Amino acid sequence: MRRFLHIFILIALVLSACQSPAEKEARALAGRIIPHYNIEFREVKDTVESYRFWTEGKQLVLEGSSVSAMAVGLNRYLNDYCHTTVSWYADDPIDIPEQQPVVAQAVSGKALVSQRFFLNYCTFGYTMPWWQWKDWERFIDWMALQGVNLPLAITGQEAVWQKVWRQFGLTDDEIKAYFTGPAHLPWHRMCNIDGVDGPLPQGWIDGQVQLQKQILRRERSLGMKPVLPAFAGHVPARLKELYPEADITPVSPWGGFPEENRCWFLSPTDSLYKVIQRDFLQEQNRLFGTDHLYGFDLFNEVDAPSWDPETLAAIGREAYSSVASVDPEAQWLQSGWLFYYDRKHWTPEIIEAYLKAVPQGKVTILDYYTEHTPVWELTDRFHGQPYIFCYLGNFGGNTRLAGPFRKESARITDALERGGATGIGCTLEGFGINRWMYEYVLSRAWDSNVSDDEWLSALDRRHHSPEGFWKSMADCIYLRASASEGVLMCDRPCLEGYHSWRVAHRTPYDPAVLERLYSQLLEYGGDSDIWRTDVAEIGCQVLGNRFPALRDRFVAACRAGRKDEARSIGDEMIHLLEKADALAGTRPELRMDRWLKAAEEWATSPEEKAYYRHSAWHLVTTWGISERLDDYANRLWNGLTRDYYLPRWKLFIDRMLADEPYDDEAFNRDCWEMEQRIVKEAPIVCDSVMTLMTYNVGAFGKYGDSMAGIARIIREEGASLVSFNELDSCNRRHPLFQLAEIAGMLGYEHHFARAIPFADGAYGNGVISRSPILRSYSIPLPQADGAEPRSMAVVETAHCVFASVHLDHVGREAKLQQIGTINNWFSENYSGCSKPVFLCGDFNALPESEAIGLVSQKWELVSGLDFTYSTEHPNKCIDYIFAYKDAAPVRVLSARVITDGTDRLSDHFPVLLKYTMLH
């Protein structure tokens, strides 16, 4: 037996040794994504990159002409046969069938372009500044699956510059003060700002070097050619003092920053430029190696030192020459953003002179913002220089549904057929949302014989959406090019329209159409992680779309002197903000605490934690020192909405409702001061606000099947723990386990406490929890003669203890005995608990009753006394939430009965409580 084992191992080793590097890396990629699937990768030769796959026996055979082609083939298998989408976020699960899907007939595809670019300098600020290796590892795998082979790779360059500037006479203190804080580094690297939130800690500089080495190693192993930076003329102001004869001048002001943050530019025509370029590239090559691709931009959103065509031609020619003199194989990748952004100065004559000054084929232009303006059409295809057609799609990491699907599809076709594009890419400023649009654009780099409608239909399947959902989204919602924008909730409050161009909330579609599509998505009731992501992202947009009308009604009521009406509408506005905050909180990528915790992970001391947290707060709020870029990076995130946007709107509502006339100038001044104070304090955002709900759902059947509607209420309100009364479990009336079903729809854990056996199944109470359930109990309660048995479901999470009860509705004595049992059980098990303890449910008792009086001896009512029953004729309060007096105290933030949209879901209204811990 041992002999056979040795032979088997030997065969395995021989087969492994026979694998090509591309086959090994493709296998390693599959091992990280779908480790238990049986896949054989075969590298084959072809004149263009291509893939082909089919099932042979019990394994998938995947042929490809490169590791990139095999990765694209693997992604198509995942998309079309496993019906799954691999997220670019490391923490998102990959949902795949347990049984490996069979491919009966071979499927193939081939590359239409050889260059597939991804990323933007800004992405390293708006999304990636705090990433660790685990984040990069998943993202690089995602890029490989999409066929990306030219990733921008600018991490870690500060260490290179540190060594270079030391050689030119600067001290370490001067160098670190020249750098910005981590979140603002992209704009420092692009010669826009110096010193903002500096000095940069040495630990950050060193840590980024090690991270970049890991990034480049993995990208290269997957057949990518990382695009590294090169010197683009940006120098410290101190260099002008050290080299007074050099052609060093200040660049034009940028972003409203003061003179102390202004950048300085060394002209490429100066002899010192080549010396610095040589030193930079040699040190970068020593640390990171090279693939001979260099991405650098000389004039990103700043003026050139001269607008004379001959001068600019000389600058372009010398900039390229400085790189080529160090690396004769150098290829310059240059953003075409400047040609769009500053069309006033970059005239056709100047663009032609600038581009033609570089040897033909040695510079490739990224046509940056084609969904708005394909610059290749305005420049005679960049005067013969190769270019990559790019979709931008997101500014500032904004979380808004945007992107012209049909228009961009047509423009891609035009660029490939008529424009001679040599590549396709994406230049998103931040990840934000709308990931599917980037997946679509990158898929167009390959000929896969799939129409747009077929691609959208496949998107339905892998997003677990209703059939035709994404086609409707593409045709009705995704109509306009993205811009710097957001929802009005994220804007500084104003009386009408929007306060700033940075949060332009124009909606190019009928919001009612999105409401209808969102309802379809909810009713479909998927239970996958990607479905829940869509629900949160689209749902936040739905809630955001409702806000402008409320603001307009509020302002109109105030101006008309109808203060009571205005106050009521103001409460609605605050509640809508709270709902959006709660809904965003269901997704980790939409949480401010995730952003801040990631920043803090780079710290080596409490002082550094505060420093990194400030950098993280600064970018996504005020951005700069003046109001020029305030809210540019707005995003409807949990925690950011609660602790930043909502206080602004509360201040606005209070000022409008005050007895004194509203002073808009004073409000904006005070609002700016409040914003600056929050950023300076850089508070910790955590799960400090918890939302509880109790709901007698009547087996989800009082008015037809109400489960999807109730799940929607829970999701919109952001309830993290929900108590349910009157649940069926696998009985003849409802053959499914109702609690497990609704928990699955929401992605929650659950615990059921059977009260009685019923119709060959069970009936009772239950709890669902968004966070892990650490302990659970099912407690039987005393039974009255002739009455149904009763039970109590108890769960303990990291945040609290939460119990669900449904007390007897017939016998007085039995009800009192049930309360006595409950009180005794908690005294024995949770007396003096360091967590809050809650008792929720349908008590079948009025507030003034003896039963509630007995409960109140041990418990404090925290949910109010509004009517909860019945939904047809509300006249009783019998559903409550209590907090245990002998446990950790809480501060109630709000408590209410939810009547809006719940009158046909059950005969009881749900009760909602928001609280935070008292410290």
Show which residues each predicted segment covers.
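Contiguous, structured surface segment used for ligand recognition
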Residues: 19-113
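Structured beta-strand-rich core segments of catalytic domains in phosphoester-bond hydrolases
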Residues: 721, 725-801, 807, 889-901
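Catalytic-core regions of glycoside hydrolase
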Residues: 37, 85, 89-100, 119-123, ...
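Sec-dependent signal peptide recognition
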Residues: 2-10
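Catalytic domains of carbohydrate-active enzymes, especially glycoside hydrolases
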Residues: 134-160, 287, 714-720
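Metal-dependent phosphoester-hydrolase catalytic domains
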Residues: 778-780, 784, 813, 817, ...
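N-terminal, active-site-proximal structural segment of metallo-dependent hydrolase catalytic domains
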Residues: 686-745, 757-761, 823-824, 916-919
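C-terminal motif of bacterial Sec signal peptides marking the signal peptidase cleavage site
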Residues: 15-17
